[in-house]
Amino acid sequence: MKTQMNYAKEGIFTKEMQIVAQKENLSKDFLLENIACGKIIIPANINHKSLDPNGIGFGLRTKVNVNLGVSNDCVDYSEEMKKVELAHKFGIEAIMDLSNYGKTSRFRDELVNVSKAMIGTVPVYDAVGFLEKDLKQINAKDFLDVVYHHAKSGVDFMTIHAGINSRAAHIFKQSKRLTNIVSRGGSVLYAWMMMKDAENPFFEYYDDLLDICLKYDVTLSLGDALRPGSTHDASDGAQISELIELSLLTQRAWDVGIQVMIEGPGHMAINEIEANMQLEKRLCKGAPFYVLGPLVIDIGAGYDHISGAIGGAVAAASGADMLCYVTPAEHLRLPNLEDVREGIVATKIAAHAGDIAKLPKERARDDEMSKARQEIDWEKMFKLAIDGEKAKKMFNERRPDDLNSCSMCGKMCAMNTMNQILKGEDVSLA
């Protein structure tokens, strides 16, 4: 099976590439060159028939991922499908099913069937439920069996924590972290490695993993099991040692034509973000970077979507290619629909802020909004806003008598005052 990367290396412009080129207003040659060298990816499993393809990487708009899925405390697949609908409403490009309880295949199959967004999973979450074995009973090849079933079902990308091998684990043991390993998948694999006194199965059988990805054109999202879970732990030896391992694994995947993106932090002080983005790009030769946040403080419980948006904006401006959304429920509970909405909007704001910095053409929509404000064209403002529905609702809650203003300024509206005086008209504030 040929992948998008293999086609690009042969100069073949696939239908998925054509769609991405049109969406991003990019040339055929630019896309082919950057997909061939791994700087742009188009996650597109051959079995995901409802997919509306999007590209991630160099020269493209920053994409946003929404996480959803059930846990053993909250098993309501109907609510999770409502989250999918909400993600589609806001034009989200990627959705990850992080279900970690029970038999998840039915929900995943439905998700692949209905979602036009690319779908990602973390197969290790599904191992216990799928295999009906406790963690210690699972053998190395069992994990690959789970990966195969996810790939066959149509998943476009998978988080695989192959970088936490015995070398990285040794460095982690020597670290003096406040929050140890905060990656769910990473903690499960580390526990398995310690209990079995064995190498990480995804690292040991990496070539077998690549064969599965090659068969279905699954993109590898190389997970950062040792990402910092606190600002104290950011940029430490454990995090960087794993990133070096991921850079080596990236090249091995590229050698056979597998598309790759790298997952990143996490929690990180704002002054460390830019350097971390540059380090990933340097070590991993420009592979797309997919970051969670980063959250710039650790005390924002209930408001972590704001902390994540601040970090995400800096990350995107500094080269991050996809942001994983963070909701107000982060660290507290499974998010509800309102949490998901707030997380989506906050992260889209962060992504767009980053795009204005690195892709100046992306300011066009903002310029249109500024013109609409100057012209006091409310309907156009609502249409251009990231969340126009909320903007219109708030406006109407205290609707002014004079629509040439809002209830904040009334007759003292600066826009209206300047519009009148520049036309040579008198201004009356009485």
Swiss-Prot record:
The record's top EC class is lyase
Lineage top rank: taxon: Bacteria
Q: Does the keyword Metal-binding apply?
A: yes
Q: Name one GO biological process term.
A: thiamine diphosphate biosynthetic process
Catalytic activity entry: 5-amino-1-(5-phospho-beta-D-ribosyl)imidazole + S-adenosyl-L-methionine = 4-amino-2-methyl-5-(phosphooxymethyl)pyrimidine + CO + 5'-deoxyadenosine + formate + L-methionine + 3 H(+)
Enzyme Commission code(s) on record: 4.1.99.17
Query: Which residues are recorded as binding [4Fe-4S] cluster?
Result: C406, C409, C413
Q: Name one Pfam family in it.
A: ThiC_Rad_SAM
What is one GO cellular-component annotation here?
cytosol
Binding-site residues, substrate: N67, M96, Y125, H161, S183, R184, G185, D224, A225, L226, R227, E263, Y290
The free-text function statement in the UniProt record for this protein reads:
Catalyzes the synthesis of the hydroxymethylpyrimidine phosphate (HMP-P) moiety of thiamine from aminoimidazole ribotide (AIR) in a radical S-adenosyl-L-methionine (SAM)-dependent reaction.
Q: Which NCBIfam families does the annotation name? A: PRK13352.1, thiC
Subunit composition and interactions: Homodimer.
> What is the name listed in the Swiss-Prot or TrEMBL entry for this protein?
Phosphomethylpyrimidine synthase
